[in-house]
Design a protein with these regions (language model features):
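Extracytoplasmic/secreted cell-surface and envelope-processing proteins
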Residues: 131, 326-329, 362-364, 417, ...
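Internal alpha/beta scaffold segment
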Residues: 321-344
Length: 457
């Protein structure tokens, strides 16, 4: 069974990335210290340096965890690590997105591959050596061993810092992409210092608190209120139906605020019909800008792809199905090599592009997604062990959520200039469901991936 699981996951993780690069085995870039196969102890507890978390509500303390800056030096092979990690997180992210969207066929969807990848790596830091193996396989950073009783471990901190380096490549204001992390542990357990450090590596600010879960309803209110306070009111009511036996809750959020590189023309905004499905039409404002774009008419996949610049390097890739074509069919074909071919085949064109104003927020239940992928039992369920997260026996990770917030305006860093040179633009009106990806252009990492079924909701 173990061999089957590994082979299935490894096949998905070995897909080509968004560029033609010399292949480097990911494990060699992210290995932990001296590469040796560490024995998996089945009986003896793993040694963990733990601390007591600050009780939630103590003097209304909402300050983030204090960062340890002693090990924040720049890493070697940074560019290569970013490129390789971008490929890995894109591959896993697209796979998870397709699982997620199967259950959200008729609703808007927003998913962050970089945020979920970081969440998994943070949880990996708390996993036992036995549980570390399926995590590494899913992430695509595993080195196989001929022995069943040992594992080659990766340096999770190195992975998380590389993810943050990818985020830092976004060349707008720092609050353009902001990541927050919350960890809530039962008050009768202590938490690993290493895990807390990983949450800090992963985020712009992290919060670790202990909670009395024996009073489940009261604990639920305290946890949700704390998240709302520390997210400036952006995030509300993440956790529901908590149990008195809860050991650990984990939540992360990523908030993207973007402006178009070239502004849309405010005077050209007009209310038009958006066809949600054959029975439903809504009236919404469509922004319009006429100018030069890079685009592709993919006749084989029956869609038009347009690149829209955001900051200097970050861009949106918008995918609009042809009239009568199925959005779901295009979603089912999403792979890193498909997106790579789209990007490579983009050509300059003169377009009159009309696009809905939209902002989007979504919440991903990671346990639910992993269950649909048939790996939750190994990673977070009954077979998962987290001796490196806490010193409490039979410690469980009960709920894991990823919150994604996406905001765009019609404003831009450059003013759109009208061109009156006699050319007739090709009209492209985004008046039906579409896909979009937010991509960091240096590493080609997909930061966000989503679909708009109805921009009015």
């Amino acid at each position: 069974m173990r061999e089957i699981f590994f082979s299935v996951l490894l096949f998905s993780c070995l897909a080509l990335g968004l560029g033609n690069r010399v292949y480097v085995h990911p494990f060699s870039l992210f290995a932990l210290g001296n590469v040796s196969c560490e024995v998996i102890q089945s009986k003896e507890p793993e040694q963990v340096d733990v601390v007591k978390a600050t009780p939630i509500g103590l003097q209304d303390n909402t300050e983030p965890d204090i960062r340890d800056l002693s090990d924040s030096n720049a890493m070697e092979n940074s560019t290569q690590r970013k490129d390789v990690l971008a490929e890995l997180q894109n591959t896993l992210g697209l796979r998870m997105y397709k699982v997620l969207t199967r259950n959200q066929k008729d609703s808007n969807t927003l998913f962050s591959p970089v945020n979920v990848f970081g969440t998994l790596v943070t949880l990996y830091l708390g996993a036992s050596k036995k549980t570390a193996v399926p995590y590494q396989v899913l992430l695509g950073i595993n080195k196989e061993s001929s022995r069943e009783d040992c594992v080659y471990l990766i340096d999770g901190h190195k992975v998380l810092r590389t993810l943050q380096e990818i985020n830092a490549l976004i060349d707008g204001p720092r609050d353009e992409l902001r990541t927050l992390v919350w960890s809530f542990i039962t008050q009768d357990a202590e938490i690993s210092k290493d895990f807390i450090g990983g949450a800090q590596d992963f985020s712009d600010a992290s919060y670790t608190r202990s909670v009395d879960f024996s009073k489940a309803e009261e604990a639920e209110k305290k946890v949700n209120n704390f998240i709302q306070k520390t997210s400036d009111g952006d995030i509300k009511q993440i956790f529901q139906n908590l149990s008195s036996t809860t050991n650990f809750l984990f939540a992360s959020s990523v908030h993207f605020k973007g402006n178009w590189r070239t502004a849309f023309q405010p005077e050209a905004t007009s209310v038009q019909d958006f066809r949600v499905d054959e029975q439903t039409t809504v009236s919404i404002p469509l922004m319009t800008r006429t100018g030069e774009y890079k685009y592709l008419n993919d006749k084989g996949r029956k869609c038009t792809v347009v690149k829209l610049g955001l900051s200097e390097r970050t861009y949106m890739l918008l995918v609009l199905p042809h009239e009568g074509a199925s959005l779901q069919d295009i979603e089912n074909q999403l792979q890193t090599e498909v997106i790579s071919k789209w990007y490579q085949n983009l050509q300059e064109g003169y377009l009159e592009l009309s696009l809905p104003k939209f902002s989007l927020t979504d919440l991903t239940d990671l346990k639910s997604v992993l269950t649909d992928m048939a790996v939750e039992k190994l990673l977070l369920g009954s077979d998962a062990q987290f001796q490196r997260l806490s010193n409490k026996e039979k410690f469980t990770v009960d709920k894991v959520f990823s919150k994604v917030v996406f905001e765009m305006s019609e404003e831009g860093s450059q003013v759109s200039t009208k061109t009156e040179d006699g050319r007739v633009p090709l009209k492209l009106t985004v008046n039906r469901p579409f896909l979009f990806a937010i991509v960091e252009g240096n590493s080609n990492a997909i930061l966000m991936l989503g679909k708009i079924r109805n921009p009015a909701v």
